[in-house]
């Protein structure tokens, strides 16, 4: 959802896909509609769309709720939506897999799209990210800590991060964008060129 909000602010037409349930799902749809964001959610008959809470009290605490169970019939509906994507379209897969679905769900979706000319972007952690590299995603976006966990070492310099990003590129990723919180971001593009950008200086209000 955060991706969609940023894209809308930048004037990029996009549609939010996924699953919603209960009153919290209806609230999410209303909120996105108020921002002018197009949605095409699949409505589940049972459960509630999860609520995540961040508590700021000296240190930041995250409370992430559990989402509704997603039946196979709903996954098939999602796949039917993805089948409508055309060559050159962009699909962003972000976050964790719902507990009611197999951890191979991202692999299932990318395998279905393989060879259709759809540019896929994946923002996920550890195995979820590594296991989709065989489908050559257009872009992956680990943060520097996640990247370090994947390659099994601490990354302290831009050279360390670049070398680790090249490892994922060799495994199949076309472009690797590494976010580094207050230190900005580093992009290793498919031509092998490195692009580095810092962040505006200011006071952090929250980390979302």
Can you name each region flagged by the protein language model?
Residues 1-48:
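Substrate-binding N-lobe of the ribokinase-like
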Residues 112, 158-208:
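Conserved phosphate-binding/catalytic region of the ribokinase-like
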Residues 13, 88-89, 138, 174:
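Short acidic/polar active-site loop segments enriched in Thr and Asp
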Residues 13, 17, 25, 34, ...:
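Small-residue (G/A/S/T)-rich helix-start motifs and N-terminal tracts that mark the onset
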Residues 90-161:
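Conserved beta-alpha-beta core of the PfkB/ribokinase-like small-molecule kinase fold
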Residues 44, 54-87:
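Conserved phosphate-binding/catalytic loop of the ribokinase/pfkB sugar-kinase fold
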């Amino acid at each position: 959802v955060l991706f969609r909000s940023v894209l809308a602010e930048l004037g990029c037409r996009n549609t939010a896909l996924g699953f919603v349930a209960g009153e919290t799902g209806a609230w999410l749809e209303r909120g996105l509609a108020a921002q002018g964001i197009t949605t095409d959610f699949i409505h589940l008959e049972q459960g509630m769309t999860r609520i995540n809470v961040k508590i700021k009290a000296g240190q930041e605490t995250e409370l992430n709720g559990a989402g509704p169970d997603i039946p196979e019939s709903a996954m098939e509906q999602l796949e039917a939506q993805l089948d409508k994507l055309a060559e050159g379209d962009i699909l962003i897969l972000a976050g964790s897999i719902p507990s009611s679905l197999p951890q191979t769900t991202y692999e299932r979706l990318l395998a279905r799209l393989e060879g259709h000319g759809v540019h896929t972007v994946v923002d996920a952690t550890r195995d979820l990210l590594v296991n989709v590299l065989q489908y050559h995603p257009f872009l992956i976006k680990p943060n520097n800590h996640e990247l370090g966990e994947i390659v099994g070492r601490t990354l302290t310099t831009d050279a360390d991060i670049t070398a680790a990003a090249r490892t994922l590129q060799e495994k199949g990723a076309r472009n690797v964008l590494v976010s580094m919180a207050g230190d900005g971001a580093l992009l290793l593009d498919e031509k092998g060129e490195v692009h580095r950008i810092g962040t505006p200086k200011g006071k952090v209000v929250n980390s979302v």
